[in-house]
């Protein structure tokens, strides 16, 4: 913390079927600052990006995230692409991207700078080499086990 100024970190994602990879991502993001705010993807955004609706609605995903000790606040994003206005409103010092998020750090930083925000954009690494911490792999395993 620089003086009395709190460092605000913002992350975003779907966070559907929460797993250990999400927890480690949130923990690493929290370690970058004093306050962690999570933007949960809107249901329509999930459907558009993944080609299917989320398993759990945004309100439920947000409630689960609020229960995690690393998370200080949760907001549900707007439908569509990342909302620069929402990010501007949240006033982050740092935006932490997950290892599998398809945002380019430099491009995102330039977009933020174009609306007057100087934000550090960091890509966090995978903690696991295998696929056990990926929602799509978990869904596949569930269907293999329970849907003969």
Curated annotation (Swiss-Prot):
InterPro entries per the UniProt record, alphabetical: Archaeal_FAD_synthase, Cyt_trans-like, FAD_synth_RibL, Rossmann-like_a/b/a_fold
Pathway recorded for this protein: Cofactor biosynthesis; FAD biosynthesis; FAD from FMN: step 1/1
GO biological process: FAD biosynthetic process; FMN metabolic process
Cofactor(s) needed for function: a divalent metal cation
Reactions performed catalytically: FMN + ATP + H(+) = FAD + diphosphate
Gene3D superfamilies: HUPs (3.40.50.620)
A GO term for molecular function: ATP binding
Position of the signal peptide: none
EC number: 2.7.7.2
Binding site for ATP: 14-15, 19-22, 100
Keywords: ATP-binding, FAD, Flavoprotein, FMN, Nucleotide-binding, Nucleotidyltransferase, Transferase
Similarity remark: Belongs to the archaeal FAD synthase family.
NCBIfam families: cyt_tran_rel (TIGR00125)
Function according to Swiss-Prot or TrEMBL: Catalyzes the transfer of the AMP portion of ATP to flavin mononucleotide (FMN) to produce flavin adenine dinucleotide (FAD) coenzyme.
Subunit: Homodimer.
Protein's UniProt name: FAD synthase
Organism of derivation: Pyrococcus abyssi (strain GE5 / Orsay)
The encoding gene: ribL
């Amino acid at each position: 913390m620089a003086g009395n100024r709190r460092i605000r970190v913002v992350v975003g994602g779907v966070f559907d079927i929460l797993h250990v990879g999400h927890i480690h991502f949130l923990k690493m993001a929290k370690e970058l600052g004093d306050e962690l705010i999570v933007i949960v993807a809107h249901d329509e955004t999930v459907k558009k990006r993944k080609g299917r609706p989320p398993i759990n609605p945004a309100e439920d995903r947000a409630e689960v995230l609020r229960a995690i000790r690393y998370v200080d606040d949760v907001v549900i994003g707007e439908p569509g692409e990342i909302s620069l206005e929402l990010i501007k409103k949240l006033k982050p010092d740092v935006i932490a991207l997950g290892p599998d998020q398809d945002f380019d750090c430099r491009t995102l930083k330039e977009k933020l700078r174009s609306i007057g925000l100087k934000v550090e954009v960091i890509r966090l690494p995978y903690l696991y080499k295998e696929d056990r911490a990926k929602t799509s792999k978990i869904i596949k395993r569930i269907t293999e086990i329970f849907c003969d």
